[in-house]
């Protein structure tokens, strides 16, 4: 990375997130806002463009008063097609007005509402930078599934194709090596990003006292993520059942997160008694970090994935990791040698990997050392500085350039 300082300017950021407001100001439930807000020190001003729920309320992640929120008309979700279409003219007017108050705009998608922001930004002669966090067709296929949602899958392919076409002309920030390759090939540069929500202070606090820690009895397993189909949380219970058959009472699983499969999972977990604990959604911060520090092994079982932020959190805590080898997981961990990787949808392989880690102290120590070193390289501050430099145009990174910065030497 060069030492040049990003040109100071006002940055607008659009990503599909609902904001709420009360007497304390704006807030949201989406953890990624922590990364967005980390860009604030690099610009003269930050303007968040997004829909605002008319119902007052407070969410876990507050937006500071120093950051402006440009409110768009509210709709329930991206599934609310009628609401989106009905409010489209008002949405375009609000976007146009917000773009008049910024010098550049980072448009994160692809979602239906992100394309108008990018097009209007170009029309207003602003510097437009795209952001891509997931493979949209793959996400829709796993998240929705079934013939009923075939039209949505078709729309996802069209939307991604349009976003990729636009990315040939404007700079793009892509999360993970796979998306960086997918969006490269045009005239514009692509920044390969590993998103981290773990600050330098977090790494220090999480890693403190983690070295040479032995596993407890029971061995504490931790999983953090949405309880939705594409995250395959049922694999956790299937693997635990196999482990219980071989070594009864040796393992205890804590599941952090909520989602559409939560009730089903709770019912299935009844047979394990106290060996499975559900914590619901725990916001990124001290309470979640306490759970990381109290655990022995981190388990990630998604069947499709971008570059999961929870891996950075687990590595910062010095937790050895077992994860499915999908999407950007291997690249997110480093070279793939920093964890045990298993095929998706394979509870036998998952159980075997967990048992191996639980019984091999030297392997856990190696993973712990590599993980903490990587977390220190990929802090929130460092990654936000890279994105700020890229958006400002002071750096032109090509796919693959990030590799030397993303792998501990």
Residue ranges and their predicted role:
Residues 356, 363-377, 389:
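A short, well-ordered alpha-helix in the C-terminal region of glycosyltransferases
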Residues 266-282:
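Nucleotide-activated donor-binding/catalytic signature segment of Leloir-type glycosyltransferases, i.e.
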Residues 335-336, 340-347, 356-361:
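Conserved acidic donor-binding segment of nucleotide-sugar-dependent glycosyltransferases
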Residues 99, 290-295:
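Short alpha-helical donor nucleotide-sugar binding micro-motif in glycosyltransferases
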Residues 320-323:
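Short hydrophobic beta-strand element within catalytic cores of glycosyltransferases
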Residues 303:
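Aromatic "clamp/platform" in nucleotide-sugar-dependent glycosyltransferases that forms part
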């Amino acid at each position: 990375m060069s030492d040049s300082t990003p040109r100071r300017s006002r940055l607008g950021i659009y990503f599909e997130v609902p904001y709420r407001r009360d007497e304390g100001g704006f807030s949201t439930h989406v953890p990624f806002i922590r990364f967005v807000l980390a860009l604030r020190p690099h610009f003269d001003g930050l303007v968040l463009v997004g829909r605002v729920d008319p119902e007052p309320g407070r969410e876990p992640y507050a937006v500071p008063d120093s950051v402006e929120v440009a409110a768009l008309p509210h709709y329930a979700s991206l599934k609310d097609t009628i609401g989106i279409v009905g409010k489209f003219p008002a949405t375009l007017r609000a976007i146009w007005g917000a773009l008049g108050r910024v010098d550049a705009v980072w448009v994160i998608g692809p979602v239906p509402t992100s394309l108008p922001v990018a097009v209007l930004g170009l029309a207003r002669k602003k510097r437009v930078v795209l952001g891509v966090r997931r493979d949209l067709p793959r996400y829709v296929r796993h998240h929705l599934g079934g013939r009923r949602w075939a039209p949505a899958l078709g729309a996802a392919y069209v939307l991604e194709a349009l976003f990729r076409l636009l990315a040939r002309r404007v700079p793009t920030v892509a999360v993970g090596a796979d998306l960086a390759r997918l969006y490269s090939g045009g005239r514009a540069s692509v920044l390969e990003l590993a998103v981290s929500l773990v600050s330098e202070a977090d790494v220090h606090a999480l890693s403190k006292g983690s070295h040479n820690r032995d596993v407890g009895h029971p061995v504490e397993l931790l999983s953090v993520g949405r309880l939705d189909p594409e995250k395959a949380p049922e694999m956790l219970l299937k693997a635990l059942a196999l482990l219980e058959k071989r070594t009864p009472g040796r393992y205890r699983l804590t599941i952090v997160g909520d989602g559409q499969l939560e009730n089903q999972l709770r019912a299935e977990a009844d047979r394990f008694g106290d060996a499975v604990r559900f914590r619901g959604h725990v916001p990124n911060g001290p309470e979640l970090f306490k759970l990381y520090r109290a655990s022995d092994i981190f388990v990630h079982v998604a069947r499709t994935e971008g570059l999961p932020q929870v891996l950075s959190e687990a590595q910062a805590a010095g937790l050895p990791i077992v994860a499915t080898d999908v999407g950007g997981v291997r690249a997110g961990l480093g070279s793939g040698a920093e964890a045990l990787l298993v095929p998706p949808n394979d509870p036998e392989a998952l159980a075997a990997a967990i048992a191996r880690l639980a019984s091999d102290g030297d392997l856990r120590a190696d993973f712990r050392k590599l993980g903490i070193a990587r977390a220190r390289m990929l802090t929130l501050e460092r990654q936000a500085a890279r994105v700020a430099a890229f958006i400002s145009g002071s750096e032109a990174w090509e796919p693959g350039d990030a590799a030397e910065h993303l792998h501990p030497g």
